[in-house]
Amino acid sequence: MIDYQEVLSRYRPTQEEENKLKIISDDIIRKINSICRSRGLRAEAVIVGSYAKGTNLRDGDLDIFIAFDRDYPEEIINTEGLHIGHAVIPNGREKYAEHPYVSGEIGGVKIDVVPCYKMSFGDKKISAVDRTLLHTEYVNGHLDEKGRDEVRLLKIFTKSIGVYGAEARTFGFSGYLCELLVIRFGSFENVIRYFSKAKGRVLIDLDERFRDPMVLIDPVDPDRNVASPVSLESLSRMKIASKMFLSSPDEGFFQIEHNGKNVQYHDRGTCIMIYSLPKPDLTDDVIYPQVYRFRSVLQKIMESHEIRVISSEIDVSDRIYVLIETPACAEERIRVHTGPPVDTDNAVDFVNSWKARDRSRGPYIVADRLYVDVFTGQRSIEDIVRQEIFNYSIGKNLDRFKKSMEIMKFNVGMKSLPVLDKFFGADVFRK
């Protein structure tokens, strides 16, 4: 049996931390409201997020929105939002989502100050962040203290297995989705039982408009699927982890701080190349789609030379790392060039075009199609990538780093890298 109270005692904020968060948030709200009055703005500060809903874990963040009257132009709330954010967060940094906002720390607590429009139930949203105000109201109206702790357990569980967070880094379960799941199913264990039995797409709400792997409609916005960020891989991880937990409950499923197992690098008899770029100072939701694109371009280059990609991995830490595993570190000396079917009009032209060209053999026929075996020059993968990467865009913020791309060939004795740890330490889930 799992002692859930013991788990909660490790991760639920202490009274001292709650007092600190209240002092900081009250002070920021007071300052924001004072600035709004002095500048004649019809706006007010609102605390949102997990702290406002009482589902926060230790060392959490504070999300404070500046809710403007709905008749303000977007340029005004963007400009004023940044001005106010910088005024209340010394040394805060500007970040960009749907609206620009200010992020920083006060007293060791990470704080985001975000502008939005006021919104009531039934109002049409002006920007996507506006509905966050209603999320707080909805959750607080549907969770009691026990329910809040059930949400905390679900958050701890999803963090432990590596599927917490809707950001592009994870494509997993947002905090709001965890809250809605507990509201829908009643408890942490009921949620786990549901996922342990789920097969195929998880359609908690039936809505043919959405084709995502998981669908749960936002109760404050019927046109939004809260579960849309959940990838098929994250959903699969949740399913198998739920099955394993129910079959053998273990406190390892509630261990957020993973010490990391001792990953042993070993020779797989393949070629493992690591492509590295400098990391721009961007939010995860901006940088990760470009990292995925970078990986996709590398795979496309391999495939264009008939080099089979066995596996891949990415990591974004001090730099951007993309690992690509192939059978060998160079293209095959002979490549099969596919020609047209013999009954097409250009079949004879294809045969004649190869009469005077260097080739290993052919043209020859297999079934109804012509082929030629050609010499490739057997270039190394590194040479191929360095030459052909410039034929593709890898993202508007990464393209400028192509010339400075570093390429490393894996060997067992090389220094430890997070991308190698992830690759060699791949498991059903982190535990």
UniProtKB/Swiss-Prot annotation:
Residues noted as binding CTP in the record, renumbered to the chain: S50, K53, H135, K155, Y164
Binding sites annotated in the UniProt record for Mg(2+): D61, D63, D112
Keywords: ATP-binding, Magnesium, Metal-binding, Nucleotide-binding, Nucleotidyltransferase, RNA repair, RNA-binding, Transferase, tRNA processing
Positions that bind ATP: S50, K53, H135, K155, Y164
Span of the signal peptide: none
Gene3D superfamilies given in the database record: Archaeal tRNA CCA-adding enzyme catalytic domain, Beta Polymerase, domain 2, CCA tRNA nucleotidyltransferase, domain 2, Poly(A) polymerase predicted RNA binding domain
EC id: 2.7.7.72
The protein's required cofactors: Mg(2+)
Keyword Acyltransferase: no
Catalytic activity reported: a tRNA precursor + 2 CTP + ATP = a tRNA with a 3' CCA end + 3 diphosphate; a tRNA with a 3' CCA end + 2 CTP + ATP = a tRNA with a 3' CCACCA end + 3 diphosphate
GO molecular function ontology, one term from the record: ATP binding
Pfam families recorded: CAA_C, NTP_transf_2, tRNA_NucTransf2
GO terms, biological process: RNA repair; tRNA 3'-terminal CCA addition
Enzyme class: transferase
Subunit description: Homodimer.
Note: A single active site specifically recognizes both ATP and CTP and is responsible for their addition.
Function: Catalyzes the addition and repair of the essential 3'-terminal CCA sequence in tRNAs without using a nucleic acid template. Adds these three nucleotides in the order of C, C, and A to the tRNA nucleotide-73, using CTP and ATP as substrates and producing inorganic pyrophosphate. tRNA 3'-terminal CCA addition is required both for tRNA processing and repair. Also involved in tRNA surveillance by mediating tandem CCA addition to generate a CCACCA at the 3' terminus of unstable tRNAs. While stable tRNAs receive only 3'-terminal CCA, unstable tRNAs are marked with CCACCA and rapidly degraded.
PANTHER family: CCA-ADDING ENZYME (PTHR39643:SF1)
Family from the record: Belongs to the tRNA nucleotidyltransferase/poly(A) polymerase family. Archaeal CCA-adding enzyme subfamily.
Protein name (Swiss-Prot/TrEMBL): CCA-adding enzyme
Lineage, highest ranks first: Archaea, Methanobacteriati, Thermoplasmatota, Thermoplasmata, Thermoplasmatales
Name of encoding gene: cca
